[in-house]
Amino acid sequence: MIPQDPVMLLSFINLKLRDFYGSLKQLCDDLDVKEQEITDKLAAIDYNYDEERNQFV
């Protein structure tokens, strides 16, 4: 289960992307979550996925 709080979600997702996954798609497939759900929640706190850096910035 992923954190529901956007700030905690940001930390959780960026850690997972840095340490375990080569892309947001891989992370979402593995954790069985919708990519749009994550991007929408993090966009609400002004963070967007940067494919080149493989993190939300």
Annotate each PLM feature.
Residues 1-23:
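N-terminal acidic leader/helix
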Residues 27-28:
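Short alpha-helical "recognition helix" segments of helix-turn-helix
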Residues 32-57:
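Short, charge-rich amphipathic interface segments used for partner binding and complex assembly
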